[in-house]
Amino acid sequence: MGEEQVQEFKLKEDCELRFAAGEDSEVVLELVHGYAEIFGTEIILNKKYNFPAKSRVAVFTWKSATIELVGATESAYVAESTPMVIYLNIHAAMEESRKKREEQAVSNSSKPKGPRLLLVGPQDVGKTTVSRILCNYSVRHGRTPILVDLDVGQNSVSVPGSVAALLVQKTADVVDGFERNMPIVYNFGHSSPSQNLSLYETLFKALASTINSQIEQNDEARLGGMIINTCGWVDGEGYKCIVKAASAFEVDVVIVLDHERLYSDLSKELPEFVRLTHVPKSGGVEQRTAQIRSATRGENVHRYFYGTRANNLFPFTFDVPFDTVTLCKIGAEQLPDSCLPFGMEVENHETKIIIIEPSVEIKHHLFSFSRGSIAEKNVLTSSVWGFCLITEVDMEKRTISILCPQNTIPSKTLVYSEVTHLDDQIER
């Protein structure tokens, strides 16, 4: 075996090292001099950080830094032009807003509510990264913001097919991101809002309502505010979803990333009290193919059950008899008007709860454990306890085999997701 590739980079003030790990090799990063951060998290001098194959990383310094990389990289270069100052200014404006609202609350004996910021823009402009940076800066300032992710295709809080929220109490791990402790999660069950618009809107409104209810008695979370990530669908019905989400979450700041027409349209549509800002995307953002997106979804599901290299999880596999659970899905085929009795109105087929019978077709699909029940008719707007993966269906024994984070099922109502995953149990 040959010696591993070693590269050293000297970064000047306000510069950024961007690198991509190779297809089959990890890269070890070390800060050997100066100060640097990765997506808003400070990195420790002389500590080694192991990034897995295919990682895309940006190391920024406000002062100067010397970075050493060990391992094969697909690319590695220093960029002198970055939007980090813009992101810092956005954070500073949010913090100033928090302080003003604290002062106003003291004078009128009210409960202060922090700023609520919505990040919008097309695919591959870096919305998830910016949300991570802003959350990290808020935490470093002593705040506890709520990270909301409405991107059902590439969710950063829970599994694909979810809308979810997380109270951020510590900065993200440099390699693994935020700890996903006790998130609020709703199972949408699709990787694009277009697959069931009525359900998508119903769920993000339910999520907003749940957050508002929970932070009513949590002063720190309420003052920390919200940083809301969205999907990359910005035209037609996707645009309408953005406007409705802004209203549902009562946002007062909207950041538009790299889309001037969207900025113009929103400036005419949103209320005057909403502060709208257009910012450029980072030059380090790369276009992702459909294949890469699919692979990322698979890695996200794998992480949900098995954790990461630094934080392993050990899920359970066990059999569940058909007659001990109720399987259902949300949404049904629309019946034509001609098939309905005279005078009967068409109900919303997109939010109809349908009982499904166990069959081999559900193998490899995710199911959520609903906090609601069919009997109480509240499955539609109930959050979930968690998820399981159907690994086998035995029609003779009338059992399903599931992969589950717990050794027992937390709910007998399981809600179907179109998201699938082949559990190869490959350690990553």
UniProtKB/Swiss-Prot annotation:
One Pfam assignment? CLP1_P
Query: Where's it found, cell-wise?
Result: Nucleus
Checking Gene3D superfamilies in the record gives: Clp1, DNA binding domain, P-loop containing nucleotide triphosphate hydrolases, Pre-mRNA cleavage complex subunit Clp1, C-terminal domain
Q: Where is this region: Disordered?
A: 99-118
Q: Which InterPro entries match?
A: Clp1, Clp1/Grc3, Clp1_C, Clp1_C_sf, Clp1_N, Clp1_N_sf, CLP1_P, P-loop_NTPase
- Show which residues constitute the signal peptide: none
Q: Which GO terms describe its biological process?
A: mRNA 3'-end processing; tRNA splicing, via endonucleolytic cleavage and ligation
GO MF term (any one) = ATP binding
Q: Name one GO cellular component term.
A: nucleus
What domain of life does the UniProt record list for this protein's source? Eukaryota
Where this protein primarily resides, as one coarse class?
nucleus
User: Binding residues for ATP, per the UniProt record?
Assistant: 16, 56, 124-129
Cite the entry's keywords alphabetically.
ATP-binding, mRNA processing, Nucleotide-binding, Nucleus
CDD domains attached here?
SIMIBI
Q: What does this protein do?
A: Required for endonucleolytic cleavage during polyadenylation-dependent pre-mRNA 3'-end formation.
Family, per entry: Belongs to the Clp1 family. Clp1 subfamily.
Record's PANTHER family? CLEAVAGE/POLYADENYLATION FACTOR IA SUBUNIT CLP1P, POLYRIBONUCLEOTIDE 5'-HYDROXYL-KINASE CLP1
**UniProt-recorded name of the protein:** Protein clpf-1
- The organism is Caenorhabditis briggsae
